A protein has these predicted regions:
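Short glycine-/polar-rich loops that comprise or flank the Walker A/P-loop
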Residues: 19, 46-47, 71-74, 115-117, ...
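Motif I (Walker A/P-loop) of helicase-class P-loop NTPases
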Residues: 31-39, 63
Length: 220
């Protein structure tokens, strides 16, 4: 695995142990494929998995990744765009255990997944995950509560960590799941400021005034 303690986290989830992690997705990694792989392992063992994301685009990404490794009947999506009737019908199917893997937007955090073993919330700093109606419930609060009460593993993931996720890490309630520093250096883009040396300024005196100096065009 590309993450420190990543393999032990996956093993714990698959074994049915309670593991909680703040996952900082490394540059270039396909987070949807990673979650799909773990959710499929959980479902294969007869348990349930729940993935909550901010918008339809992320739901589509997770659904596509899941359908590459599990049957379509194993995956249930719950989004506002489906309309009340279709959403309620899918809610009932989840309640009766007809779909072991549920993927959806904010309200999917309440999905009654049978034998829930693993839950994931991506990009928990996104405003779409906060209910605009009182009491303004955040999907993060729903899933952390469910993890505590139902004893399921939990991932809070994103490219950056929110203050709330950091507090959970510092309190010891969950641990961090990050790539080693050397790996991050290798994956991160090389950043070069235009006109950051006397040599560059001699070659292109107008670099300070130009929106795109000549060095940018040369790099492109």
């Amino acid at each position: 695995t590309a993450y420190t303690f990543g393999e032990s986290f996956v093993d714990a989830v698959v074994a049915g142990k309670i593991a909680r992690a703040a996952w900082q997705v490394a540059p270039g990694d396909d987070w949807a494929a990673a979650l799909a792989s773990l959710a499929a392992k959980v479902a294969l063992d007869g348990a349930g998995a729940l993935i909550v994301v901010p918008d339809q685009k992320d739901v589509d990404a997770c659904e596509a990744a899941l359908k590459e490794i599990v049957g379509a009947r194993q995956v249930t999506t719950l989004t506002a765009s489906q309309g009340p009737q279709a959403r309620y019908s899918r809610y009932l199917s989840v309640l009766h255990g007809q779909g072991r893997i549920v993927v959806g937007t904010r309200s999917a955090a309440f999905a009654p997944v049978e034998n829930l073993r693993f839950a994931a919330l991506m990009f928990d700093g996104d405003d779409n995950l906060v209910d605009p109606r009182a009491p303004y419930v955040h999907a993060r609060e729903v899933l952390t509560t469910r993890s505590a009460q139902e004893g399921c593993s939990l991932i809070l993931g994103g490219h950056a960590r929110t203050a709330e996720a950091q507090l959970l890490v510092e309190s010891g309630w969950m641990h961090e799941l990050v790539a080693p520093r050397q790996s991050l250096r290798t994956r991160s883009p090389y950043i070069h400021a235009a006109g950051d040396s006397d040599f560059e300024m001699e070659r292109d005196p107008r670099a300070k005034q130009a929106r795109l100096p000549s060095s940018a065009f040369q790099a492109a």
